[in-house]
Regions:
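N-terminal intrinsically disordered/low-complexity leader segments
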Residues: 1-27, 216-218
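Amphipathic alpha-helical packing segments from all-alpha helical-bundle domains
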Residues: 87, 91, 116-119, 135-162, ...
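Generic hydrophobic, amphipathic alpha-helix propensity
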Residues: 28-37, 53, 78, 82, ...
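Hydrophobic alpha-helical segments that form the core
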Residues: 168-187, 200-208
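Amphipathic alpha-helical segments used for helix-helix packing
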Residues: 102, 114-139, 189
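Helix-turn-helix
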Residues: 31, 38-73, 77
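Hydrophobic alpha-helical connector segments
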Residues: 77, 91-119, 171-177, 198-201, ...
């Protein structure tokens, strides 16, 4: 529960005209960002324009520019929204009593999201490529990566403390898992006739997590 509290907080608000107006603005911004993610995936960063995002969003140019002044602002906001959505998506994994089950669920939730909407997964390789040449993108992507690694690390630490996992380096172990998480992203780009994302991640996660498990008598 403590891990979840660090990532998710729900506020129950009584509906008001101001609240509804703010909610409408959030919905519009999300529509713009989802559209931007599609444009970024299809055209890349340097070949895409604000006009492309306007067309994809089916909003007026004024509406888009009301929230974002440039394509760089939009794409940086895409990273922020992806991080927020991922935190909410993965929160149930930290609620599992077993760290093993929690990490397995982590993989499963990512695969489920990929199947439902691969928009953000599709543009991740492009965002990493931009980060190599732009410090602002690098800082944003590094922040997302660091928080995600810490989230995984906390679940592993709990497993060690509960004597569910052997004594291992939590940072290295979390990195190992994350490198395999990234394998999911490639299923959003390259299609395989023989292996699907769900089968791949289930088998790979089992291999890794079984190596972490504390065996009886150890």
């Amino acid at each position: 529960k403590g891990i979840v509290d660090k990532y998710v907080c729900f506020f129950y608000l009584r509906p008001t005209s101001r609240f509804m107006s703010e909610k409408s603005q959030i919905n519009k911004k999300e529509e713009i960002l989802f559209s931007a993610a599609k444009v970024l995936t299809n055209k890349g960063y340097y070949s895409s324009t604000m006009d492309d995002i306007v067309v994809e969003s089916k909003m007026s140019k004024g509406a888009v520019y009301h929230y974002y002044s440039s394509k760089k602002d939009v794409y940086l906001a895409v990273i922020d929204m992806w991080e927020q959505r991922t935190q909410l998506l993965l929160a149930p994994a930290a609620e599992e009593e077993s760290s093993y089950k929690g990490l397995k669920k982590l993989f499963q939730l990512l695969v489920k999201e990929l199947k439902m909407d691969g928009s953000f997964f599709n543009c991740l390789p492009t965002l990493w490529a931009i980060a190599r040449h732009d410090d602002d993108f690098k800082k944003s992507m590094q922040r997302v990566y660091n928080r995600f690694q810490k989230f995984v690390e906390l679940i592993i630490i709990r497993g060690i403390e509960n004597k569910e996992f052997v004594k291992l380096d939590p940072k290295i172990s979390s990195l190992s898992l994350i490198l395999n998480f990234e394998g999911i992203f490639w299923f959003s780009i390259f299609k395989s006739k023989d292996v699907d994302a769900e089968s791949y991640i289930d088998q790979v996660s089992s291999y890794i997590l079984n190596a972490y498990m504390l065996k009886k008598g150890d």
